[in-house]
A protein has these predicted regions:
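Gly/Gly-Pro-rich "capping" loops immediately C-terminal to redox-active cysteine motifs
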Residues: 28, 39-80, 102
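Positively charged n-region of N-terminal signal peptides that target proteins for export
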Residues: 1-5
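Residues at helix-coil transition
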Residues: 15, 39, 57, 89, ...
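Electrostatic cytochrome c docking/interface patches
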Residues: 14-31, 42
Length: 123
């Protein structure tokens, strides 16, 4: 039994911190700031910001019917956890010229929770 417990402990320690700490309910609460401008539903419409349904694996600036900035359209980003976290930490600093007027997510735990929620809500 001790060997199994040790293997489990090693596995948990090797998991990325974001995966260990992610709380989708807290992420949904964090998304409250985002849903003023974004929807996540499959048939959701674009608001001030684009619909985020299916965002992971999608090329940035590619939602039909949304008027993106040239910076976003030409960024070459395909959204994954790293690119999303980098952008959401400092939207204006990470992509000068984009339109998103959001100061950024400043805390790692909030970011992990938000990403976990987005993965769940945007599939």
């Amino acid at each position: 039994m001790t060997r199994l417990a040790t293997l489990f402990a090693v596995f948990v320690l090797l998991m990325p911190a974001a995966a260990r700490a992610a709380d989708t309910a807290a992420g949904q609460a964090a998304f409250a700031k985002c849903k003023i401008c974004h929807t996540v539903e499959a048939a959701g419409r674009n608001l001030v910001g684009p619909n985020l349904h299916g965002v992971f694996g999608r090329k940035a600036g590619s939602v039909d019917g949304f008027a993106y900035s040239a910076a976003m359209k030409n960024s070459g980003i395909v959204w994954d956890d790293d690119s999303m976290a980098n952008y959401l930490r400092d939207p204006r600093g990470s992509m000068p010229g984009n339109k998103m007027a959001f100061p950024g997510v400043k805390h790692d735990e909030e970011m992990a929770n938000l990403l976990a929620y987005l993965h769940q809500a945007t599939q």
